[in-house]
Amino acid sequence: ERSEDDLTHKLVDVIRINQRLQENRDAGAPQLIVEDLWELLQYHITTYFDNQTAGIPPARHRSGRPLKTISQRLKGKEGRFRSNLSGKRVNFSARTVISPDPNLSINEVGVPIECAQELTVPVRVTPANYQYCMDLILRGPEPKFTEGKYVPGVNYVIRPDARRVKVTDKNADEVAKRLEVGSIVERQLDDGDIVLFNRQPTLHRMSMMAHTVRVMPGKTFRFNLPCCPPYNADFDGDEMNLHVIQGEEARAEAEILMKVQENIRSPRFGGPIIGAIHDHISGNFLLTWHNPKLSLEDATQVLSRIGFKGQAPAIHEEKDARGETRRFVYGRDLFSTLLPPGINLSYSSAARPSGQKEREARLPENDFWVVIEDSKLVAGGIDKASIASEKGKLLDHIARKFGNQAAREFLDKVTKVGNGFLTLRGFSTSIEDEDLPDAARDEIQKKIADTKARVDVLLKQYKKGDLQPLPGRTLEETLEMEIMRETGQARDAAGETASAFLGMENSAVLMARCGARGSMLNLSQMAGLVGQQAVRGKRIHRGYQKRTLPHFKWGDLGAEAKGFVGASYKSGLNPTEYFFHSMGGREGLVDTAVRTSRSGYMQRRLINALEDLKVAQDGTVRNTAGTVIQFVYGEDGVDPTRSVQGEPVDMEQIFAAVQRSGKKGGK
């Protein structure tokens, strides 16, 4: 028997019961049987509309599968509304794995040739482009690389009478001869086409941006690393979607509103969300901190990466040990060539140790204060605080003062220079970067012993009843809080010891300090000690009866028995420490999974609540019914994208500019 639609099954049931009811009634059957059939008919009608009614067993298929009836077809994520009306599958799209390519501009996306061959852009034939379209068709459907440049082919020609003609190598000449004005040529993807690029989950508007195409060999989409944060992408196997825009208006709209450079600054916090990351930061920091000297050859090599054309940095000369003249360029001068004219900034660098005063940071031996005067870097190292996303003051200033185009050009240049210098200089990190001298290890062991001794003293006071409870806390809570404080201090002290012995000549420390990757806490856990493991903000207390593991005595409240890890990752954890560490890690994983589903549902509710709000012509925020929600957008009328970290005006910059103009005027 042919498999029928579930609704057909239900309708068959309804008709069958109706017939039986009529036959029984006409035959004068007993009241009981008629009522039974009457109820059965009600059951079939109910399940025809909704097969998940509470208190009613669902109607099932012969195989035992519950039937999918009218209500189930409309409801929920897989239902008609959300699955087929709000969201549809589309043509002219591609999906594949993503890879990094630091040589592309942030505006570009590398598209595999296979994708470019399949995806097409409609070109309407006019008298002006008639010859161009003829040439396209004559090439046939196979794209070519001529003199290193990609040349697209044509897949279809749509005649004015709406007939589609597939272009092949055999019929290309014939189709070209019969080409008329008004036809549409479906051209394959070409360099410079505007496409939309998206990564799911699409959580904010920067998860879908417009890029220009660069057709490349290979089978993955390529894009530049600064674009990772808005998409929240990494290259461990993520896939992304590409949509080819078909209309001319849509293309213009995407280019003006959605292009990557138009979204460098985020409406979430009024700062750049696209910025230099990882290698770019460590490269530029090493290029500018303490102003190193680069040989003229090396400087030329680095600048050639960005196709530099402009005022070359100042060239200096010095005699080397053999008395030969050596020509060199200062790193800061090289960096200054990337800056647009007229920049004056002064701020702390990210590498500055916490607690260091500005006066100390400005000392040449420290060099942790960035000073840019008239677009010349005078002091400090360029790090996370200058060019990274979210925190990058210099990048933010360029985007604000000179516009998105200038910010994009600066970002493209600064990332290439950072990579170029790092490649030239060499930069390696290994497990040996976490090695501490014996003196440091002894100091850390002494601190661990002191902590354990202090915890034992607290336990003795608790058992004797000498421990004073904190206001509003029980004795047990007070003990736990005091022990947590002691173990926390132990980890901090070990971190300080590790930091004292690991200097900026250590690659891992340099990465952490300049903000390229990792933190000093990560390093202190690798080299010093891991510290107290916590579950739900408390020491680990669950496990066996009166103890956490069978390796401890009953009622043991000491540091090790409750999850204090005194070892470092480098030295390795013993089995009990490893177990406690896994408990802490497991909590993190569960927390992440729970948070994701909660926030997803919350965002959905928020979107549904706010989807009909817009700023009306009179500047008020209204819904479709015309109800006023706000008299001025955001109560202050400030566009968060153009704000300065949420503030409407950057007063410090204005004061500094006025002071400078006063000095120049001699007043």
Please describe what each predicted stretch is.
Residues 2-5, 89, 273-277, 401-411, ...:
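Structural motif
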Residues 80-81, 121, 133, 140, ...:
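Intrinsically disordered, low-complexity regulatory segments
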Residues 1-264, 331, 335, 368, ...:
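Core mixed alpha/beta domains of very large multi-subunit molecular machines
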Residues 13, 323-424, 539-586:
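Function-dense linear segments that define catalytic or interfacial modules
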Residues 7-13, 237, 410-420, 600-615:
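Hydrophobic/aromatic-rich, well-ordered segments within soluble, folded domains that form packed cores
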